């Protein structure tokens, strides 16, 4: 059952990614699908990573855990062994130290930046058009726009919905990934939204 759910979600993400590549006329270096770790929902991220679809990227987002550097190293090592792109959320120093492929910035960090961090790949979280445009001005590689649907990770946040997601995607030239409440059951609703791919937590557990 888990394998089938993951396969359907990965297929939906690849379909979005293919449409995006056709539109922009160039290949994308980033995966079509990303898994976000979570300190509460994925206390053992290594076990979850083992079950991910082939080619699925990983954003290490365990912020408030003991021995964060050691866990980040283990995650980056596991991703390298499975040929997965690993991005570390937060500062670029930890991402560099553990050998990750890049860094992912939460929106509050994105807003404070005036220049792009010196990392091969830099992505950011965005919840508004202002954040999207700031990421674009900095020359980031992609943004994760959320929450698309209602999500346990942010129960009080107002979901964008398909129309809101589509509208914001059109505001930027950056690749935009849909995040927040994404599952194999609703991913197909974003087929015409112009996104570059999908990202999930619970949808990949």
Which role does the model predict for each range below?
Residues 31-37, 58-60, 86-88, 103-105, ...:
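Hydrophobic faces of well-ordered beta-strands that scaffold small-molecule active sites
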Residues 51-55, 98, 138, 171, ...:
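Structural motif
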Residues 69-88, 107-110, 115-128, 158-183:
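Alpha-helix-loop-beta-strand connector modules within alpha/beta enzyme cores
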């Amino acid at each position: 059952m888990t394998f089938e759910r993951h396969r359907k979600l990965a297929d939906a993400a690849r379909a979005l990614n293919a449409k995006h590549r056709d539109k922009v006329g160039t290949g994308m270096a980033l995966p079509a699908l990303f898994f976000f770790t979570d300190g509460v929902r994925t206390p053992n991220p290594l076990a979850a990573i083992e079950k991910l679809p082939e080619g699925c990227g990983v954003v290490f987002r365990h912020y408030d855990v003991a021995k964060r550097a050691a866990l980040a190293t283990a995650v980056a090592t596991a991703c390298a062994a499975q040929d997965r792109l690993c991005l570390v959320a937060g500062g670029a120093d930890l991402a560099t130290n553990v050998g990750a492929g890049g860094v992912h910035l939460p929106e509050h960090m994105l807003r404070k930046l005036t220049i792009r961090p010196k990392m091969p790949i830099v992505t950011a979280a965005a919840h508004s058009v202002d954040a999207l445009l700031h990421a674009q001005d900095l020359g980031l590689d992609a943004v994760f726009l959320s929450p698309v649907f209602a999500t346990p990770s942010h129960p009080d946040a107002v979901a964008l919905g398909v129309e809101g997601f589509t509208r914001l995607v059109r505001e930027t030239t950056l690749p935009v990934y849909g995040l927040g409440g994404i599952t194999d059951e609703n991913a197909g609703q974003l087929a015409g939204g112009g996104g570059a791919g999908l990202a999930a937590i619970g949808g990949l557990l």
